[in-house]
Regions:
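Alpha/beta-hydrolase superfamily serine-hydrolase fold, recognizing
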Residues: 2-4, 12, 22-408
Length: 408
């Protein structure tokens, strides 16, 4: 693990055994942040954001953000880390990075993700923690569209937030790791191209409209964007125990010696994509005794399209490159080939670490900057994945990837 004077250490979050230690954890007093909504009030109602068959109404909180400014004085606009929370695409909140000390029924313990946020601020980064629509509010690619809209929002309002629109990175854990990889590696197949709401049909979100560039509207969601002329391309990304291939998650678990079904999962994949895999041929022939499931009211064709396109591994494999256009909004970063750091616990029984290994190997084959940290004995969501050393390594990797030290 490397360290640098430009990336201050976060000391004391864990003890020698890697267990959270509240007594020695740094206390960040008076954390300042601002909250808001990256989809403006009423916009999602007026434009009837597609839910792709989901069952629950959308509230304004689905588009909430917390923005934490850089705390280190810097002479130029700060780079921005957009943090995407986890929670099986159905739970979680953007507020998870607010408090560095968690108060639970069992007592106080360090919030290692918030400590990561504080370390980034101290290193000159701004951090934005965002919400997105849960799978019961919008099936995929709804959540992906939301994260990309958040990137566009901060890019469009960079001056107001004091950030550099060319130096935006995205990161997240678990479901947030999956979405972060999707944002990073689906790129911006028509960067800067404005798409009016009338120019893209509702079906084009699934790649069926000749008026939209190939893959573009399915991955981008510009038809319902308030900032369609702004790029969603990011300069770098990080995934903590994220899913890279939803098709293989259920075979990876038994192969790794874990149970096929995981209590934290509870059908998260089919609830996100619209059906179990393989996709049933007909809603009327669903056989629940065989484990087949379909979200009520979903279009089978949409579920099929989701199962074809919702996997970061397909976007990074050379033979399945999604995007071949280099974005002018992120110099040196080609669509589908964004620098990516991966962190995964070796004892992860929910998302086996092989899910990250495959992405790492694919990026190495393509000679794309990447790093993989495997954490011994760490389970899914383990605080040891955010140890001070790993936070240091993440800072160094992202600093290099966005060329933060260029000319400094």
């Amino acid at each position: 693990m490397q360290t640098s004077e430009s990336t201050p250490k976060v000391e004391g979050a864990l003890n020698a055994e890697g267990v959270p230690n509240v007594e020695s954890a740094p206390k960040v007093e008076g954390t300042e942040y601002r909250s808001g909504f990256y989809r403006e009030a009423g916009f999602y109602d007026a434009h009837s954001l597609p839910d792709y068959g989901a069952q629950s109404p959308v509230t304004r909180e689905a588009f909430a953000y917390d923005f934490f400014p850089a705390t280190r004085d810097i002479s130029s606009p700060a780079p921005l880390l957009v943090w995407v929370h986890g929670g099986a695409w159905r739970f979680g909140t953007n507020q998870a990075l607010r408090d560095t000390i968690l108060r639970t029924p069992g007592g106080e313990q360090p919030n290692t993700q918030a400590l990561m946020r504080a370390a980034f601020q101290q290193a000159g980064w701004a951090v934005a923690s965002i919400n997105y629509r849960y799978s019961h509010q919008a099936l995929f690619p709804g959540a992906l569209h939301d994260v990309k809209e958040a990137v566009r929002f901060f890019r469009a309002n960079a001056h107001e937030f004091g950030i550099d629109p060319q130096r935006i990175a995205v990161a997240g854990g678990s479901a947030g790791g999956h979405l972060s990889m999707m944002v990073a590696h689906t790129g911006d197949s028509a960067a800067g191209a404005s798409v009016s709401e009338d120019s893209v049909s509702k079906d084009s979100a699934f790649g069926d409209s000749a008026s939209a560039p190939e893959h573009d509207e399915y991955f981008e969601g510009r038809a319902a964007s308030a900032y369609p002329s702004h790029s969603s391309q990011v300069a770098a990304a990080a995934s903590f125990y994220g899913v890279s291939d939803l098709r293989t998650i259920f075979t990876d678990r038994p192969l790794a010696g874990y149970a096929l079904d995981h209590p934290e999962d509870d059908g998260a994949e089919w609830r996100l994509l619209g059906s179990t895999h393989p996709v049933p041929a007909d809603v009327s022939t669903i056989d629940a005794s065989k484990g087949e499931r379909v979200v009520p009211g979903v279009c089978i064709e949409r579920a099929q399209k989701n199962w074809e396109r919702a996997h970061p591994i397909d976007a990074v494999r050379p033979q399945k490159r999604v995007n071949k256009v280099e974005s002018a909004s992120a110099p040196g970063v080609s669509g589908g080939a964004t620098a990516l750091m991966l962190v995964h616990g070796i004892s992860d029984s929910c998302v086996p670490y092989q899910q990250s290994v495959r992405v790492y190997q694919a990026l190495r084959t393509r000679q794309v900057p990447t790093d993989l940290v495997l954490v011994p004995d760490a389970e899914h969501g383990d605080s040891r994945c955010f140890s001070p050393d790993i936070v240091q390594q993440m800072l160094l990797f992202l600093n290099r990837a966005i060329q933060i030290n260029r000319g400094v």
